[in-house]
Amino acid sequence: MKLKWYWLGTFGFSLLLSHSAMAADTTLDEIVVQATLRSIPIADLPESVTVLDRDTVQAAGVQHFQDVLGLIPNLNWASGTSRPRYFQLRGIGEVEQYQGAPNPSVGFLIDDIDFSGVGMPATLFDTRQIEVLRGPQGTAYGANALAGLISIRTADPGTSFTLKSEITGATYGTRAAAVAVGDGSAAGDLGWRLVAQQYLSNGFREDAYLNRSSTNGLDEGTFRGKLHWKLTEALQADLTLMHVNINNGYDAWSINNTGTTYSNQPGRDAQRSDGAALRLVAAIGGIGELRSVTSVARSKIGYSFDGDWGNDVLWGPFAPYDYYQSDDRSRRTFAEDLRLIGDPSRVLFGRIRWLAGLYTLHLTESDNLRYVFNDQYSGAGSSDLDSQYSATDVALYGSLESELGARSTVSAGVRVEQREAHYADSADLQTPFPRQTNHMVGGNLSWARKTGDGEHVYVTLARGYKGGGFNIGSQILAEQRSFGPESLWSIETGFRYTRPKSPIQLQTDVFYMRRQSMQVYLSEQLQQNNPLAYVFYTQNASQGENYGLEAELTYRIDDRWRVSSSASLLRSRYLGVSGLFADLGIDGRAQPFAPSYKFSAALEYQHPVGWFARLDVTGMGSFYYYTSDSQTSSAYSVENLRAGFKHGSWTASAWVRNLFDAHYAQQGFYFGLIPPDYSNQSFLDRADPRQFGITVNYELGR
């Protein structure tokens, strides 16, 4: 608690300090948000958003989106994978997908390609901008963005030759190499860009039984191509192709909660994704602009782990006690977003700007879930579950925006969506799963006002939604085999200060969200002597609420020093629960992975000669891991440091992540594992320890 108030006090003091220095002559660049229905300067956006630009990503990150998560208010992730897949915004999101069909609450896009629920391909090299929209995106994105949206955009082709290369070496066997090359015509009619990167690391764990330090290793390759082509004065095309091959090990858990594991069958966490997106923009004279974004993606995912985290030598007289689980998954998506944007010079009734769109998404996923076991009670054996899931979403949406006088703007949007989903598996031959059809409506109503030079306030009322889904397993009762949609109402008010030629940018917001027919994820261990004998299911509870505040500040003190910081407070609760949920005693309790506070602060120095440095401090409060038990994390803070020298096209930097080697957990389980009594106890997935590294960059053009 002292840590919480210390950092919030520091943040507040920095606001006062920066306000007194607004007359400084250093300026910050304008930020444009692109993940919204139409590109818009951040000052004019009537909702909460965090934007990390190219320089911030390069200074604060090393390899993956995971490296910069701490900079974003009210964003968390559930570990249990080698890289983040499951995110929570403002306390809402998934914690895992051990069984069943995909049903994300947080949308995840990379260059217009949908990776919601499978966001491991989010490597950082050559990233141009990361945008995180908090709150329901009921008009723009619908069912996959109940809690918000994460959008990553990589560098586009330029108008001249560009070359960028990078090599990294670090402790724990880490090494990486990357190159980006591109060219384009001076007029911007034609341009291309190619990217290749490979990253390897031992992965911060030591398997004492196998005497190996790479069982939790990272092996990540990224390949991407982009083409920009202006076919005519009225038509342009942008094509993105990507291939990301992640072949990571997974051996993170230990019976004594340390970085030393004892697995005899280490797992893997692999994802091979291929994706393509084609964006066409056509000018239609007298009407406006027609935009078409077509995207396809295919991901093959292999996830496995040692179920008992041990070996027969470790278990001694209780051996054999050996479990292993693997899940081989294949996902395909096809999406089309067709949008007509009215010509700003030909507004309706002299003042109303408009747009309308049609969206469709088709997703198919097949799974092979396999359990292998050998113990004193059941002997040796295995079981398999094969499943298929498909869902088709079709949505119509539209938006109107009008000026109310010289300073105020009002906007409204609506989205009507239908989802048809079907699930079948090898265990449902006698009682097939019913086909599920959901009809959902979302939208927003916003008012914004320019209160002064560079000062904006806004109020937004929004409604989001999320489709229903399926529960699997022979232990699931017939009436529990499916669950219904969830909806969410949100009201938010905020203030932004983005005065031109000012060294300061500030944004704050306060929000309240009420969840209806809230989807709650539960798990239960069925046999104390079997660590894989679990049933996982989701049910609709009565209600929930999530409310809090968020603030971000960037202040360029002078041409050498810059300060940036963020802070968020969050309160989440289950409300009016009954039945099974009442038996769990969760009424009024916080929701999982919803820390009560989160903060970040960064100090940057840039000397005219070329020396530079950046110190980051990030942290968050404690949170519950799961609804089914009362285990919580501990509050923590982490420091990262980077310093180096830039000369011409060359940059060399030395960096340290987790500078003071903080020990904290990022995930926790509570169950019976250790013989002979198999009593329930807490097991923790420890975060990465301190790591030192050196990175050298060469860049010609941008």
Pin down the residues of each PLM region.
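Short acidic/polar hinge/loop motifs at secondary-structure boundaries
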Residues: 97-98, 105-136
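N-terminal periplasmic accessory domains that precede
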Residues: 65-66, 86-88, 109, 132, ...
